[in-house]
């Protein structure tokens, strides 16, 4: 007796990610089950389904201060008002002329004067506030004034700071570098699995952080008078960090057309 042939059957299986598979199977403890089977997507659904890769990117950038301010104080106390004024103005003119000869622009020099009576004498004091963008030039000018002027002229330690525009540029740079790092990561992932990276579908900056210097406030206030110029520049350096999350479209490898 001949055996009756079984009619051919077709089985459609879709590989399901482990997370989906575990949800569908509801695995019981101590018992193994077969991977879940799902109905295949229709050709229309397969074409419209968007494949994507989600990556995060981080960055940390820093920038030193772009401005420094130095204050030069000149004072004189005399019994005669004219003598006090003459003493201060003579040294004040010498300071401003020296600054201009060294290439300091007039808009970066601010002069204030104060004249008052002190008991039976007259006291005059003048301040020259100088803003520098070149720190090497600042040090040369300060050294020159210390050498040429007497002890009645007091030169304050430089105060370093950032202009608002430079801080905003640093924030943008941190975000852009984080986006670039995320794009490179997604590009390498797609190359590894034989796919082509598509356009970004979502770009989100999740976290930003800024901090200044590497010396804590207590230590900085205690040592501010003894810090060197380079240490002050380092403590005034601003750091910015950014973290972004990006979703990219994933395309299949494009097949090269064979030309007949």
From Swiss-Prot:
Gene Ontology biological process terms from the UniProt entry: immune response; positive regulation of canonical NF-kappaB signal transduction
This protein's domain notes: The disordered region interacts with HSPA1 and HSPA8.
Residues bearing PTM Phosphoserine: 56, 62, 235, 242
Its job: Component of the IRAK1-dependent TNFRSF1A signaling pathway that leads to NF-kappa-B activation and is required for cell survival. Acts by enhancing RELA transcriptional activity.
UniProt feature coiled coil, ranges: none
PANTHER family: INTERLEUKIN-1 RECEPTOR-ASSOCIATED KINASE 1-BINDING PROTEIN 1 (PTHR18842:SF2)
GO CC list: cytoplasm; nucleus
Quaternary structure, from the entry: Interacts with IRAK1 and RELA. Interacts with HSPA8 and HSPA1.
Compartmental location: Cytoplasm; Nucleus
UniProt biased composition (Polar residues): 41-50
Region Disordered: start-end pairs: 30-50
Lineage: Eukaryota, Metazoa, Chordata, Craniata, Vertebrata
Keyword Cell inner membrane on entry: no
GO molecular function: signaling adaptor activity
Protein name as annotated: Interleukin-1 receptor-associated kinase 1-binding protein 1
Region (Required for nuclear localization (NLS)): 240-260
Alphabetically ordered keywords of this record: Cytoplasm, Nucleus, Phosphoprotein, Transcription, Transcription regulation
Main localization, broad class: cytoplasm
Processing after translation: Phosphorylation at Ser-56 and/or Ser-62 is required for full activity. Phosphorylated on at least one of Ser-235, Thr-237, Ser-242 and Thr-247 upon TNF-alpha activation, which favors nuclear translocation.
Family label: Belongs to the IRAK1BP1 family.
Residues bearing PTM Phosphothreonine: 237, 247
Gene label: IRAK1BP1
